[in-house]
Structure formats: C-alpha cells, structure tokens
Amino acid sequence: MAGLAASFGSGAMTNSITDLIESDCFLITGSNTTENHPVIASVVKRAITQRGAKLILADPRNIELAKFATVWLRQKPGTDIAWINGLLNIIIAEDLLDKEFVAERTENFEALKLAVAKYTPEFVESITSIPGGDLVKAAHLYAKAGAASILYAMGITQHITGTDAVKSLANLAMLTGNIGRPGTGVNPLRGQNNVQGACDMGCLPVNFTAYLQVANEEHRRKFEDAWGVSLNPKPGLTIPKIIEGADTGAIKALLIMGENPMMSDPDLAHVEHSLSKLDLLVVQDIFLNETGSLADVVLPACAWAEKEGTYTNTERRVQRVRKAVNAPGEARDDWQILTMLANKMGADWKYVQAKAIMEEINSVTASYKGITYERIADTGIQWPCPTLEHPGTPILHSAIFTRGRGLFSVTEYIPPAEQTDDQYPFVLTTGRILYQYHTATMSRRSQGLVSRTPEAFMEINPADAGELGIKNGEKIEVSSRRGSITLRADVRDRVDRGVVFIPFHYSEAAVNRLTITAIDPIANIPEYKVCAVKIQKCS
C-alpha cells in the first residue's frame, strides 16, 4: 500500500476484477493466485484460454499457474527488485516505452532511466538465476501488449524491500502506459476479505480514514472537529513496534482484536516472551486461539454471519453484510465491545446500531461519502464515490493520478536480511495453501478442509532430499537461528534446489518459530519470505 500510495497517490487495486478479462497480458508475481484468490485466478485463466492473453509468471515455486504461463521467471526468493528493474532496463533500451504517457502523466523519468541502466539481462541473471533470454521475452510481451495488467500479493511485499518492489511494479506500469484503462493497472490482491476496508477506515498507525495523515495538522483538525476531541499528532505503532514495546516495558497493556500474533508474527519465541511481560493482555475474538490462551481477559466477539456492516474487498468494492443468526452466549459485535469499553473509561459514545457508524463514515470519509446501506443493497459500489449520485469508480487514474503526476521511484536491489551459510544452507519461504486460511483459527475447525491437508509439511526438491537421505512423508526437523519445528517432508520439484516452502497454518509446527524479525523500514512488514534454515531427518 505504501508503495502504490507513493507512486500514484492511492494504495489500492487500480482496476476491477471483471475487467481483467480484457487484459492481453498478465504479469503475476508474489501471488499463488489459484490457491489464495481462486475467483480472480478463474478470470485470468479465462482470458488466457478464451482470448489468447499471455501470462508472465514470476514465482520461485512451480505453482499451478506455471502451466498457463508463456514465460515463467523462476527467481531466487528476495530478488524481485533486480528482475523488475531488468524489465525496465530492456523496455527503455529497446525503445518500447510509451513516450507520450511518460511525458504527459509522470515525473522523474530521467532518474529512473539512469538507475536501471546497470540492470542488464546478464547482471539480473547473476542475481536472480532468471535466464537473460526469458527476461527479454517477458519485457517484450508486457511492453507490446495492448493492455497489460500486474497482479501481486504478499510474496512481493513481505520482504525488507517490499515497498520498493511495489514501487518498481508501478514504474513498469507507468513506463508502458498500462494504467487507467480496462485490462491494465497494478492490482494488489489483499490477504483477507476486509483488509482494504480496515485500511480505508484508518487501521494504520499513520492514517485516519481515507488515508488522511495523523501528522498533518489540517487532516487532524478535520477529525478533531468531527469528534469534538484533541488528537495526538504522533503516529501510532506498527505491530513489530508494539511487540518491541511490550518487550521493553514501554507498553503495559494490549487489546488484540481479530489477530493471532502467536501464530502470525515472526520469531514466535520472542513474541511469547514479549507478551508475557504485559501487565494486561485482552483478546477479542470468536474462538480461543493461541494468543487468547495467553490472555488475562477474553472478550467474545461475533462471527461474520452474526453481525451487520460492510466489507470492502480487494477491488475497493464496499459490500453489505447482513446478520443471519444470533450470536451465542455473551458474544457481541466488535463495535459494541469497543463502545462499552470506551464508555467505561469515561467516553460518551451513543452508537446503537451499525448503520449509525456507516453514516459517520460517510461524514468524515470523502471516498465513501456517497456509499449508503441502501445503495449497496445488491452489488456494492467501488470507491471513490464522493456523492449520492456518483456510480462509483471501477478504474482509478484514468485521466490523472491521485497525486497529480505519477512518480517514477528509484529502487535498488538489496539482498535479504539473512543469508544462507554452511550451517543453515537452505532458503525458507512461507505462505498459504488452498485448504487452510491464515492462522487456521477457523479453517482447521472444518473437518472437510482438515481431511485434505491434515498435518504440517515442508516442500523440498527431490535432489536436496536425496542428498539428505530424506524420503517423501518422513518426519524431519527444520531449524533456524531462532527455533526448530518438526513436520513431514513433501518431496517434489515444486521448489528449486536450495529452497524449501512451509505453510504457516499449523500451530503444532508453527513456521514463524523460524522466521526473522527484520522489517521493511517503510511499511514495517516482516521478511516472512526469506530466512536461512537447516534440515535433518528425525531419528
């Protein structure tokens, strides 16, 4: 989000899911779209099989989409900026750029041109292991397409250079004029059904709603006037900084809502140690998860079918959610719990229904001003929707970028924070699988899903497994400099030599006991996708 906001002025999917069918070429990277966003993957596949669209896939794993790819760029994990800058280099060197778009709608092109000059196919191959010829072919496919679309997810962002990698993708779209039209754009596929909505509503430590900045006096005054309070001008803390604060004693109490850091955060031993130092830990959730087990107080929340409200999905579509069943026991809507807590602490909040909160959102959020429960009763509306007469905005940046001109950012390849060595010779990358969801608080309660993927596993290349004497299905121990887990080996060529993959859904073999706490300095996202590990058979 920070990368797109810097480049375009808006950190969201530029296009709509339905108009992806009009793409002539897709560049998909950092996204196992078939397993993590299957509906979107079906649109991509239809464009390929029915319209003849081309697919450039950049992924270190042999995922299902590889069989649909015209070119598969199998990069080393953590080398994304190098190969993206390589594409930029080729497009500029071979005069494949959209000169009119660059001149009329962007700035800082000359600095970009100078910066990417060294990223020749040969130089990129030395970093990424992508054959130079494949990189050239990909550059031509993307630049010469009538409409080319970029899709990416957390495989791009969960690195110490994640923000810069997204800026590089934005550079690529602007360089070729692939923005603001059907079938084009830069499209982040969000990790959960309402991540976009949560960010829109200010669930980011630096922002109010609609990405107005906490540190900006004019922005802050707007919310002070609306709420009748004085607001702290200092931005809040990101999750890594919160855990750090708990460890140092700077943070004494913590309320965790709908989050499971004892599964989702890196270096879980450190997380557990830090949370244990709190004077008070309150967890608000629908099930007692691994984090809830450490809590002093647990507040029972409502599940999606038990409450009213809206979700804003990955294409910025605000959709209505209606209560279908009553919540069990003492479970309450999140807004009700927060209202009760606030009033206990001396506030005078008068919310009595979710609709009143939506009306407040309309009053302080320009991009949601024209979105009401009545208007989104059926199909939802895509923001920005500034008036009650406005139809919504399926495609962003058609005539002008949110920031005015699009900004070409200079980015450089920086190696991952942790490198392999003789003691820890394998690169571990992590992610999701089709049959489980995030920390599996909900999905592992489904026997149907559990039956498909009953236990934790690690993908390892057959050549590597052979050298270690490991057979498919055998128990193995995987260790990093931070911890160890035991799980089963899944021996197949889905990963390249020297790389292993473990999904993060399994509490009995929580892969985040291994991952590193290094973070992107801008977005503060941990580097979940690269750390060094060693592997041995269990005796």
PLM regions with names:
Residues G197, N207-Y211:
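Acidic, glycine-rich segments within the central catalytic cores of soluble metabolic enzymes
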Residues G180-P182, D422-Y424, K529:
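Short, basic and Ser/Thr-rich N-terminal targeting/leader segments
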Residues M1-N194, M201, Q213-H390, L428, ...:
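Cofactor-pocket helix-loop regions in the catalytic cores of large enzyme subunits
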Residues Y142-K144, T420-D422, E527:
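Solvent-exposed loop and beta-edge segments used for protein-protein assembly and interaction
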Residues E224, P415, P521-I522:
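Short, P/G- and charge-enriched loop/turn segments at secondary-structure junctions
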Residues L299-P300, N512, A518-D520:
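Catalytic alpha/beta core of large soluble enzyme barrels
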Residues D520-S539:
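Long, low-complexity intrinsically disordered regions
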Residues E374-P462, E467-T515, Q536-C538:
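Long, compositionally biased stretches
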